[in-house]
């Protein structure tokens, strides 16, 4: 499997499109990878990506013409405990950044005769700039794509989800001609809440990419989480890591749990204190794929904490289809009502667990180490999931049809 070489027939009728978001197409994250794959085959000369200048696409992933915006942020040297005191200054910077962004975006649209704008809600000032642009040039075909539930994003990071921000999102939804959600659950919720039609698109892989990834004949040793660790998944990750640590001490085994991604500063010490855990930074997409193929178990967690409830409920992790395509065992560890757990239930993908209870995790780890929870019989089910929900050619065609 190599999603760097996906071949999608470009839509000849697509019009010039400007993407306005926090991260560029091809950025080294789930956000950037998903956009890169969904825009596969889209003519580069018809695609612009406007984003804060400090975020850049990964090597070999620059599929659009970049428009650099300001990057207002708290200074790195400022201690976390002073972040609230700095907040008024940050708001002033964001206000100025939004005003400048509108001027840059308006000039880009007019100078290049752009017809479509794709807006992805993350930072309020960027969303506000996109809305202002559409008010100035209402002829633009506004397409909205929600990757992370915006209210959930605020709650998870303990940010104020003010009435003004709720109105901002509601107005963008109302003005959009096409709306995309990242999961069935998110689409259903938004249709019920806002009374509009929502389509579903997310990351995918080529339909012929599934490999028969055998897990080897020896005792399982390598567990891999390919992704970042933040508030969206930390409580699940630490509970699972501690269960592996307890198992190693009881059984004298050396199961190794590798995290290949960025770990939030506030969580790094808790994980690095465990002997079973190996923390790596983000790696190239190709290196990540190779590590997946070499692992005995691929770990797919989402948080159980109340503050992360909406994110867990509606999100669909970028790595899900890539995990399935390796043919390796995937451990679905998420709340039972979450979109990702429901995917596992739809196709009876195992192993899966909907709790962070220590006894339940101990039981799972012990059984997995003995080869009783390897999920090896689910390759045919993984193939069904990939064909029915994660075929990138179908997803990209659905997505790009919005930009005519």
Describe each region flagged by the PLM:
Residues 185, 203-204:
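Carbohydrate-associated surface elements
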């Amino acid at each position: 499997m190599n999603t760097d070489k996906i071949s999608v027939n470009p839509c000849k009728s697509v019009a010039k499109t400007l993407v306005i978001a926090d991260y560029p197409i091809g950025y080294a994250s789930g956000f950037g990878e998903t956009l890169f794959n969904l825009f596969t085959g889209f003519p580069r000369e018809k695609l612009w990506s406007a984003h804060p200048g400090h975020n850049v696409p990964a090597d070999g992933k620059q599929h659009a013409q970049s428009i650099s915006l300001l990057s207002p942020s708290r200074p790195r040297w400022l201690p976390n405990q002073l972040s609230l005191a700095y907040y008024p200054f940050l708001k002033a910077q964001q206000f100025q950044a939004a005003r400048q962004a509108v001027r840059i975006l308006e000039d880009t649209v007019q100078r290049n005769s752009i017809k479509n704008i794709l807006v992805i809600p993350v930072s309020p000032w960027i969303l506000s700039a996109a809305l202002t642009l559409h008010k100035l040039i209402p002829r633009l075909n506004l397409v909205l794509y929600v990757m992370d539930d915006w209210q959930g994003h605020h709650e998870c990071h303990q940010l104020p989800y003010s009435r003004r921000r709720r109105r901002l999102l509601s107005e963008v939804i109302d003005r959009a001609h096409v709306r995309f959600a990242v999961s069935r659950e998110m689409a259903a919720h938004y249709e019920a809440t806002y009374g509009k039609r929502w389509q579903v698109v997310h990351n995918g892989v080529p339909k012929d990419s599934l490999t028969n990834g055998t897990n080897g004949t020896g005792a399982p040793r390598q567990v891999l989480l390919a992704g970042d660790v933040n508030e969206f998944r930390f409580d699940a990750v630490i509970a699972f890591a501690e269960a592996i640590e307890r198992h190693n001490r009881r059984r004298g085994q050396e199961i190794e749990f590798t995290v290949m991604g960025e770990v939030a500063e506030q969580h790094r010490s808790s994980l690095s204190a465990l002997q079973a855990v190996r923390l790596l930074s983000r790696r190239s997409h190709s290196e990540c794929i190779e590590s997946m193929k070499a692992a005995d178990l691929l770990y797919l967690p989402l948080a159980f904490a109340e503050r992360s409830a909406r994110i867990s409920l509606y999100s669909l992790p970028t790595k899900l289809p890539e995990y399935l395509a390796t043919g390796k065992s995937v451990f679905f560890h998420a709340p039972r009502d979450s979109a990702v757990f429901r995917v596992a239930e739809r196709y009876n993908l195992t192993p899966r667990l909907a709790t962070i209870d220590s006894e339940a995790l101990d039981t799972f780890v012990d059984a997995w180490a003995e080869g009783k929870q390897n999920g090896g019989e689910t390759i045919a089910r993984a193939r069904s999931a990939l064909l029915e929900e994660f075929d990138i050619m179908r997803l990209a065609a659905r997505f790009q049809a919005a930009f005519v």
